[in-house]
């Protein structure tokens, strides 16, 4: 998005980063990057709009994308800020995240060419800094026919009013059951899901529940539940929901 107009029917906006695990592993990720990666593997041609540093990690991101035949024209390079990193820790088997700030993806620039997207996917984490937040608002203001918001509430990098402002105006939202309870103000039980959909004028809501699978709720009152097959061994679940988001997007 630097210096030229970009076009993309399927746009993915947000962070690309490296997850750093306690055992020393470093895994390329970030929910938007993972979603774009999966969509590319399905044969789609998503335009990933993100930003990396002018460093070895940034070069590794570009190399990985080229190896997947992904479009790199929306991947910006920041001359000062580093490529994103997240230190992942586990407590009672549940992951926690220490997200390094600032990072290159906090400074995703709009430039003169804001793409017209048919479907725009974005998360909530990239809302934390003003530059990326303003670029996202320009993308949303450019008239995508469908906006899919993937909520990721990562303390301390979220604000309830700010996240809800982006939920409103979207057609589809994905979040886990804890995040739904946070955004619904504790009113997620019973008819609370229907009220959340109605109050935010959504077409549908995808709610994940870990080992209990996921449920799709629609504005028409439909409910579709998917339960996972029994797992013999789980290494970690970081990024698992991003594959689900990708499959959901393919069906919209």
Each predicted region: which residue ranges?
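Conserved phosphate-binding/catalytic region of the ribokinase-like
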Residues: 1-9, 190-252
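Glycine-rich phosphate/adenosyl-contacting loop at the front of the ribokinase-like
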Residues: 1-71, 233-234
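Structural motif
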Residues: 9-10, 118-119, 172, 204
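Active-site metal-binding loops of divalent metal-dependent hydrolases
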Residues: 16, 125, 151, 243
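Conserved N-terminal subdomain of the carbohydrate kinase-like
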Residues: 18, 45-124, 143
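Active-site beta-loop-alpha junctions enriched in small/polar residues
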Residues: 102, 125, 152-154, 178, ...
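Glycosyltransferases and closely related glycan-assembly transferases
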Residues: 130-145
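Conserved phosphate/ATP/ADP-binding segment of small-molecule kinases
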Residues: 145-146, 156-223
């Amino acid at each position: 998005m630097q210096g030229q107009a970009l076009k993309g029917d399927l746009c993915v906006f947000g962070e690309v980063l490296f997850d750093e695990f306690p055992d020393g592993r470093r895994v390329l990720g970030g929910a938007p990057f993972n979603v774009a990666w999966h969509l590319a593997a399905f044969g789609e041609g998503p335009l990933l709009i993100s930003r990396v540093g002018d460093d070895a990690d940034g070069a590794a991101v570009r190399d990985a994308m080229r190896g997947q035949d992904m479009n790199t024209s929306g991947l910006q390079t920041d001359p000062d800020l580093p490529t994103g990193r997240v230190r992942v820790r586990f407590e009672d088997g549940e992951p926690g995240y220490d997200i390094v700030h600032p990072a290159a993806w906090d400074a995703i620039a709009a430039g003169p060419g804001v793409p017209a997207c048919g479907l725009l996917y974005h998360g909530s984490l990239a809302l934390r800094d003003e530059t990326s937040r303003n670029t996202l608002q320009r993308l949303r203001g450019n008239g995508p026919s469908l906006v899919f918001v993937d909520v990721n509430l990562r303390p301390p990098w979220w604000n309830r009013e700010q996240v809800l402002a982006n939920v409103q105006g979207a057609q589809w939202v994905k979040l886990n059951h804890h995040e739904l309870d946070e955004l619904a103000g504790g009113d997620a039980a019973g008819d609370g899901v229907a009220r959340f959909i109605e109050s935010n004028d959504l077409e549908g809501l995808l709610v994940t529940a870990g080992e209990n699978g996921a449920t799709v709720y629609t504005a028409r009152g439909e409910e579709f539940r998917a339960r996972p097959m029994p797992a013999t061994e789980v290494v970690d679940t970081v990024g698992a929901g991003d594959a689900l988001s990708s499959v959901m997007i393919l069906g919209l």
